[in-house]
């Protein structure tokens, strides 16, 4: 199955490497040779709408199954509905939430109200934590490892029998007892926050729930039911373990504490293509999936100093240079949506990332556009460092580093106006992590220079994503760092076999992140509201 996928993706027969990059990753792949790849991997315009509908309960006869990695809020699909009891006062719902075993249920929501938050079970059932609802709602949880049908539904129903086990399906049985006051508005939308699929860690052969993107991608590659169906022998496990370590690196937070560099929290729709699903998953770690030497390699996003240098001894033809990206490929801001854990996993906008330099760090001789005169401290006198006035939007060439807390944008001055990339993050639920991914996308887009180098066969050792140093006297390159984004086979002008290496400039600085880079995110959180159904005795009378 994997071979067929590779053949379908690698449309050029000469290609020896396959990269499944993430949508935003290839937004920076410039040059005619990469334009086809860029178009193929750009994000779907309706991705944000799809994300927003994941907590909505559906009732479809042929609904696609879902795979949940990390933690997610999901509405599920009603696969069975029946009324029982006197006057049909009891309504039974079977809501399937995942097509596999999950680790745990953490909470249940009716519309926008949390009715259960992991409280005590009673005989395998949970009652609503909401005081007014508790007599009318009972929920039975099944994690997908069940070996028998739900006993309560089996006993109450004449149609649901002991044979209805729903193997390998995580589902809830929800029993609602009719009450005009509680359900006057009709059937509530039912959603649940769950810890999703347990995955294998190849470093110690343990299986447990994890938010590590590398381990979850490894699981999807090996999944014979819904994934790529690859064997372990065809996956370079050393790359899995290395990527796992990168994802687990601790990032310091401005508010104190740390967070893992990358996590994955979201839902894979099995109706989506394997290619698009892998792209979305690798996006959670700013990474890539490479097929090289007969094995898949998983790489998490990080800067690795080059250990290979290309010089005149390896070059067999003229280097093609593109010094600047088109306006369509370059942008100076990144914005988008994510499913915010701070807002109970509803669709939210993460703080937009734009080019910003704080006073004290301006580079003399460079042109900037004023963004703010003050940013939480003393104001900046931009007229003292080359500006004609202290006015937001004015361009100036810095004559000094500046003082105070004012900010200015290098990229806005270069482009003349704001150009945003709209980047949805379907597997990122933390606003700071979303900001880091967006900032990385922004800085990578500003790496303007792309080259195609015809090399001898020694270049066959390169893989997509490798950083290389290039030394060339004519172009003035002295170990200039580029990232390999593609290559093809061809012939040089004198008939030699050539490996045409396509690369784009890169730098370690684009991976830098400081707590001062964090923008304020105004999350809604949870609010306790009086529901009007319980009388509270007055006090202090």
Give residue ranges: language-model regions.
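Acidic glycine-/aspartate-rich tracts in secreted/extracellular proteins
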Residues: 303-304, 372-382
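Short, well-ordered loop/turn sites that connect or cap secondary structure elements
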Residues: 102, 362-364, 462
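Polar, S/T/G-rich
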Residues: 2-8, 24-283, 292, 339, ...
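Long hydrophobic segments that form regular secondary structure
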Residues: 345-355, 411-490
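Acidic, small/polar-enriched beta strand-loop surface segments
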Residues: 100-106, 311-356, 411-429, 513, ...
């Amino acid at each position: 199955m994997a071979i067929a996928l590779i053949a379908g993706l690698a449309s050029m027969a000469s290609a020896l490497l396959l990269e499944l990059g993430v949508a935003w990753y290839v937004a920076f792949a410039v040059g005619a040779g990469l334009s086809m790849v860029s178009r193929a991997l750009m994000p779907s315009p309706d991705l944000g709408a799809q994300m927003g509908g994941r907590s909505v309960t559906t009732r479809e006869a042929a609904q696609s199954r879902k795979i949940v990695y990390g933690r997610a809020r999901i509405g599920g699909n009603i696969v069975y509905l029946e009324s029982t009891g006197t006057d049909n006062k009891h309504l039974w719902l079977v809501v399937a939430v995942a097509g596999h075993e999950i680790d745990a249920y953490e909470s249940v929501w009716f519309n926008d109200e949390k009715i259960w938050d992991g409280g005590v079970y009673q005989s395998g059932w949970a009652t609503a934590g909401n005081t007014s609802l508790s007599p009318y709602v009972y929920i039975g949880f099944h994690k997908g490892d069940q070996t028998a049908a739900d006993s309560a539904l089996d006993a109450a129903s004449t149609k649901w029998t002991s044979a209805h086990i729903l193997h390998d399906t995580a589902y809830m049985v929800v029993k609602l007892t009719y009450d005009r006051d509680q359900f006057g508005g009709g059937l509530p939308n039912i959603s649940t926050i769950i810890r999703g699929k347990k995955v294998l860690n190849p470093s110690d052969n343990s299986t447990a729930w994890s938010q590590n993107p590398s381990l979850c991608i490894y699981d999807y590659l090996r999944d014979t039911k819904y994934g790529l169906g690859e064997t372990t022998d065809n996956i370079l496990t050393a790359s899995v373990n290395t990527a796992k370590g990168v994802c687990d690196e601790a990032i310091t937070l401005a508010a104190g504490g740390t967070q893992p560099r990358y996590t994955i929290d979201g839902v894979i729709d099995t109706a989506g293509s394997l290619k698009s699903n892998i792209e979305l998953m690798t996006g959670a770690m700013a990474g890539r999936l490479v097929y090289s030497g007969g094995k898949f390699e998983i790489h998490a996003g990080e800067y690795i100093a080059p250990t290979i240098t290309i010089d005149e001894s390896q070059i067999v033809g003229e280097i093609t240079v593109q010094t600047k990206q088109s306006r369509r490929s370059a942008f100076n801001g990144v914005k988008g949506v994510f499913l915010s854990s701070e807002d109970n996993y509803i669709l939210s906008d993460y703080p937009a990332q734009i080019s910003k330099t704080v006073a004290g760090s301006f580079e003399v001789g460079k042109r900037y556009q004023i963004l703010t005169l003050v940013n939480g401290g003393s104001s900046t006198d931009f007229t003292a460092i080359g500006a004609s006035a202290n006015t937001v939007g004015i361009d100036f060439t810095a004559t000094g580093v500046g003082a105070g807390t004012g900010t200015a944008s290098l990229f806005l001055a270069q482009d003349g106006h704001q150009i945003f990339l709209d980047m949805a993050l379907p597997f990122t639920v933390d606003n700071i992590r979303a900001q880091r991914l967006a900032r990385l996308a922004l800085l990578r887009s500003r790496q303007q220079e792309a080259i195609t180098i015809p090399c001898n066969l020694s270049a066959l050792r390169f893989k997509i994503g490798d950083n290389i140093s290039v030394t060339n006297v004519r172009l003035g390159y002295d170990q200039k760092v580029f990232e390999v984004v593609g290559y093809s086979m061809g012939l040089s002008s004198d008939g030699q076999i050539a490996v045409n290496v396509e690369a784009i400039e890169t730098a370690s600085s684009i991976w830098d992140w400081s707590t001062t880079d964090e923008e304020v995110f105004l999350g809604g959180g949870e609010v306790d509201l009086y529901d009007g159904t319980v009388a509270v005795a007055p006090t202090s009378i």
